[in-house]
Every structure is written in structure tokens, then in C-alpha cells.
Amino acid sequence: MTTLMVQGTTSDAGKSTLVTALCRWLLRQGVAVVPFKPQNMALNSAVTADGGEIGRAQAVQAQACRLQPHTDMNPVLLKPNSDTGAQVIIHGRAVTSMNAVAYHDYKTTAMQAVLASHQRLSAAYPVVMVEGAGSPAEINLRAGDIANMGFAEAVDCPVILVADINRGGVFAHLVGTLELLSTTEQARVKGFVINRFRGDIALLQPGLDWLEQRTGKPVLGVLPYVTDLHLEAEDGIDVRQGVKHARVLKVIVPVLPRISNHTDFDPLRLHSQVDLQFIGPGQPIPAADLIILPGSKSVRGDLAQLRERGWDKAIERHLRYGGKLIGICGGLQMLGREVHDPLGLEGAAGSSQGLGLLDYATVLEAEKQLRNVAGTLSLEAATVTGYEIHAGVTTGPALAQPAVQLADGRHDGAVSADDQILATYLHGLFEGSQSCAALLRWAGLEDVQVIDYEALREHDIERLADLVEKHLDTAQLRQLCGVA
């Protein structure tokens, strides 16, 4: 059994992508490999085969390994629900919410869960490919660390350090990170990968030579800047990302502070007939064919922000002019009359008035609903697959006209009597070809082109493995992975 860990000099250095690439590359070598991330902080999550939730990046990495996602792949998931606190999910199940100070004291317990999951995976697979979090050199977070070098030291594994050259300062990032590690941690770093390089590698070579001489560690390769990958991100969305013009159907997604599972919109971002725009603070909602209220980790707080930004009035105007509106998960809850949080699960206990566009109310309960589901859309009887991740129980007359008939006999969501509003708890609505096409036609798009989102994702995973073969030192990688 071999464990190899990828750590980064910064957030968004390329850790998730590199782990995905290495997983598929190893699979091509005939090696049974499994992804692992000890601790993840993200609002994008996926439902696992064993009925829990993990970070979405680990679900993509599982696909790279041709495995079903499992809670052991990401034993600790932190889902921020305020500026200072987060819901703590252990082995796929929410156990509590706590602030940063309380979580620091909880890390010993969390580490036990991390090591138990790693032990199970390492007993079942010859290679465990691990992704770190953020940077291992955050001085204020090093005590009790379970996400980076604290984990690497505990399981005695080698580390690859990746840095993003596109941001500038790559040599300072790599050398500075190394300098801030302890002597034993420095010894764990077996080499560097430089990510997102543009230009002639010959111009970079003097810097690479200096880096190897300065640190005594090899550069395992330089990965090129790739602009058109279609793999889900695990962290926050850039509201400037994905803005396209000259498309047929205009779709607007208001970006609220606690937006969750924004990966729901990746298929729309890639669709050639859709102009998808994320609207952030200070931006008015423009005229559009479809507005989608996304999921939220703090529904009442995001409702207040929506009103403060004047977006509630923009949504009402949008509907008056015949536009279509979809609410997904937290967005569904916002569309109703009221949202009640008697236990204070998402902040202070209390109730908030919803937008009042559909006749139902939601009560947030401690037990979270986690399911992968399949069913049929009320629109065109289109096949739909997706997943539920929510703590709310919604009741009311509007549910008598459901949006989805689920295969397990349940109904989901609602469609308004005037057919302008569709609300659902299902994430992943647009990933299926049939359901995506049906929803786009409902929103006003004619002659819809069908895209196979799953095939696009699989193609990109293969492309990443090709980049490993072409640009990294595969002989050294095989040695680090214990592969002959």
C-alpha cells in the first residue's frame, strides 16, 4: 500500500485537478487507486453511494478512478454557514455547527475520523491519492493540523507540492512554503509541480534549474495553462466566470453569500445555446428568459440579502413580463411563504417571510435528507436524475402540482398554476440530456441542442491524464506511487 499526497502553496493552486489527473493516469497503468481528502471546506458537495455527502471534487476524483463516491474519500467536510462558523460533517453526516475556535478544539476528534477512513481505504486499495487543503504553511493553522502536513506526518506519506505560475511569484511560493515547514515536513516533499504555465518552457528552464539547486528537490514537471476544462469546482464561484454573449436563451443566477452547489449550472455554462450570467452584489438583474435561485447554506440570511439588493422586486418584474423562474433546494424554500428555523441550524433561531410566489412553507429540521434519486419531470415526462442535500421539510397546497415524480414513489417540488415557476429539491437537474432539454424548452428555447455532460466530463478527465503523460516525470511518479 502506498499513500501519496498533493499539497499546494495556495488555495486554487491546482491540487484537485492534479489529483484527478494522477488518479486517471494510474488507472490507465492498471493500478487500483482511490482518492482521499482528509478535510474539505466547500459548499459544493455530492451524495455518496453509502448515503452521506462529500466534497464535489472528491466525487469527480472518484469518477477518475471509476469508483462510486464514498464518505471515506472525504471524512471531514466543513460547510460554512456564517463568516465565522460552519456545519461539521463527519463520515458524510452532519454532527454539529461550530465556530472556528470551537472547531480548533474539535480537531483531535476529527483526526480520529480521518485516520479511520484512511486505514479502511489503504487496506482496500494499493494506492491512496490524497489532496491537501489550502496551504501547509499557514502558521496560524499548523497546530493540530489534519488537512496537510499533520496528516502526512501521521500516516508517514510523501508529498508533491504544486504551485500556480499564472498568478506570478511561483518561486517565492514554493521556496517560501518549504522554508516555513519543519525539517521533517520538508523531507516529505519529494518534488514540485508547476501548474498553468503559458509560453516557451525554455524561458522558464533557468528558474527551474535554480529551484532544484536551491531546494535540492526535483521539478516533476510543468503543466500548461488549460482554459476549457469542464470539471466542477469545489470552492466559490467567480461572478465574472461563464459570461457569454450572442446566445439564444438568457439565464441569470443571482449569487448570494451562502450559495451552495453552484456546479448545478456547469451544463448551462457549456451549452452553446445558453447565455449564462452570474449576477453579484451591486449588479441589477437584467432582462432574461430564465432566472434560477440556487441552493443556499443559509436560506434566511440569503433571503435577507436578496431583498437588500432589490432582487426580489426584479424577480417580480421578471414574472410580470412572462419570464420563467426555477428555485433549486434553498431556492425552492425561498419561493414559499415562510422559512422556519426553530433549532437555529443556519444561524439564529427564528422565521422569515419567503417571496410568497408558491403556496408552501418550510421548516428546517436537524436530520438532513441525503439521496441520489431518479424520476420523471412533469415537463414532457423527461427522465431526470439528481441528488437531494437538504434539511428542510416543505408542506403546502402548491406541492399538489409536483415538478418531479420520483422513482421511489415520492413527489418533489412544485410547478405554479401559470407554468412560470418550477421549484425542486433536486441538484443536478441540468446534467441529464433529457431533463436539460425539457427545461430549456420550457424556458423558451426552440430547437434545443442536446449535450452529453457526462461524456464531456469523462473526456476532460482523459485529457488530464494525457497531460500527466506528456508533461510530468512519470518514472518518478511511478516510484513515488510504488508502481513498477
UniProtKB/Swiss-Prot annotation:
UniProt keyword terms in alphabetical order: Cobalamin biosynthesis, Glutamine amidotransferase
Family matches, as Pfam families: CbiA, GATase_3
Similarity remark: Belongs to the CobB/CobQ family. CobQ subfamily.
Gene Ontology molecular-function annotations: ABC-type vitamin B12 transporter activity; catalytic activity
InterPro entries to which the protein is assigned, alphabetical: Class_I_gatase-like, CobQ/CobB/MinD/ParA_Nub-bd_dom, CobQ_GATase1, CobQ_N, CobQ_synth, GATase_3, P-loop_NTPase
Residue span(s) of domain GATase cobBQ-type: 248-435
Pathway: Cofactor biosynthesis; adenosylcobalamin biosynthesis
Function in brief: Catalyzes amidations at positions B, D, E, and G on adenosylcobyrinic A,C-diamide. NH(2) groups are provided by glutamine, and one molecule of ATP is hydrogenolyzed for each amidation.
Active-site residues annotated for this sequence: C329, H427
Residue runs in coiled coils: none
UniProt keyword ATP-binding present: no
Example GO biological process: cobalamin biosynthetic process
Gene assigned in the entry: cobQ
Protein name: Cobyric acid synthase
Gene3D superfamilies: 3.40.50.880, P-loop containing nucleotide triphosphate hydrolases
Keyword Lyase recorded: no
